[in-house]
Every structure is written in structure tokens, then in C-alpha cells.
């Protein structure tokens, strides 16, 4: 039951009245976090998988791995993220600082979405180069073919075309 009482890789708990729901993960997946096997077997938050023969490596779902692995709220500042660019609601970026000048570090926001029946809150990828569509968004089924969600097969409507700054 520890899996259900904690959180899903840093996201809201998947507990249901003290018991694991169908989308809840197994405690053997990612160290002490509640992590679905699919997180380890494919990719998480649109970034490369940490899968090793069906099990997670020590790097999976740790709060310090925002840019190159699974992105958790604890490592991302969502308050600075804008939502005014791109195609489709909730896709955008924000600039660091308040001068209005383009910064070399852009917070690329990804919107709320559902993955394996679990709601993930907004998060940012801090980078001076635009992430690809599927790196930025752990896409919904309406955006990607389910077997490739979070990887490389987003439909164009999911992608952000109008916010690609020059570093």
C-alpha cells in the first residue's frame, strides 16, 4: 500500500480509498517512488527511458533530473511559464527575468495531460533551444498515437511552431 500512499513519480497519488487503482504502479519499478511500469518501459515526461530489462535504473523519477529525464514539479518553476504561443491551448513558454528581453534560458511549458490515466501537472523544460513537440509534451492520445506518446509521433496540432527563440 506504500505505493498508493506516496505519489506517482512526484505527481499526485494514485491511491483510491487506500488501495491501488488500475493505473497505480508497482513499488519495484522506481526505487521508493510510486511509478508505473510504463514509465520505465517507454519514456516519462517525453524524455528518454531509464528502462533496463524492464526495470528502472537509479536515475528514474528523481527530483533532480528535470532537463534530461523525468520532469517533476519540484524541479520546475511553473509560475514563470506563459501560455501565449503555439498551436492549441496551453502550449507556450515564458522568459526568465522581467526585462522583456529574450533570455538564453527559456522555460518551455508543457500543458496538463493524462498519461496512463494519471493527471500530470504543468511543468517546464529549461533550455535555450526549443524541445521537440513530443519532448515538450507528454502527449495525449488525441495528439499522438498511444504507443508513441511522449516520443516522436505527435500530430502537428500538438506542436509549438511560433515560439522558437534564437539563443
UniProtKB/Swiss-Prot annotation:
GO molecular-function terms, A-Z = structural constituent of skin epidermis
Q: Identify the InterPro entries for this entry.
A: KAP
Keywords from UniProt, A to Z, are:
Keratin, Repeat
What Pfam families does the record tag this protein with? Answer: Keratin_B2 (PF01500)
State the tissue distribution.
Expressed in the middle/upper portions of the hair cortex, in the region termed the keratogenous zone.
CC per GO annotation: cytosol; keratin filament
Superkingdom classification of source = Eukaryota
- Subunit details for this protein? Interacts with hair keratins.
What family, per the record? Belongs to the KRTAP type 1 family.
Q: State what this protein does.
A: In the hair cortex, hair keratin intermediate filaments are embedded in an interfilamentous matrix, consisting of hair keratin-associated proteins (KRTAP), which are essential for the formation of a rigid and resistant hair shaft through their extensive disulfide bond cross-linking with abundant cysteine residues of hair keratins. The matrix proteins include the high-sulfur and high-glycine-tyrosine keratins.
The protein, known as: Keratin-associated protein 1-3
Q: What is the lineage of its organism?
A: Eukaryota, Metazoa, Chordata, Craniata, Vertebrata
Amino acid at each position: 500500500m506504500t505505493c498508493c500512499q506516496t505519489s506517482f513519480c512526484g505527481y499526485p497519488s494514485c491511491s483510491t480509498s487506500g488501495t491501488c487503482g488500475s493505473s497505480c504502479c508497482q513499488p519495484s519499478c522506481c526505487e521508493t517512488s510510486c511509478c508505473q511500469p510504463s514509465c520505465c518501459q517507454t519514456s516519462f515526461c517525453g524524455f528518454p527511458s531509464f528502462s533496463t530489462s524492464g526495470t528502472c535504473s537509479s536515475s528514474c523519477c528523481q527530483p533532480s533530473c528535470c532537463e534530461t529525464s523525468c520532469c517533476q514539479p519540484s524541479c520546475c518553476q511553473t509560475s514563470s511559464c506563459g501560455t501565449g504561443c503555439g498551436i492549441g491551448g496551453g502550449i507556450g513558454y515564458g522568459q526568465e527575468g522581467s526585462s522583456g528581453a529574450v533570455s538564453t534560458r527559456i522555460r518551455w511549458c508543457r500543458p496538463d495531460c493524462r498519461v496512463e490515466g494519471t493527471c500530470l501537472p504543468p511543468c517546464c523544460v529549461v533550455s535555450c533551444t526549443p524541445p521537440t513537440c513530443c519532448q515538450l509534451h507528454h502527449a495525449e492520445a488525441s495528439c499522438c498515437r498511444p504507443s508513441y506518446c511522449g516520443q516522436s509521433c505527435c500530430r502537428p496540432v500538438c506542436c509549438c511552431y511560433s515560439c522558437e527563440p534564437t539563443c
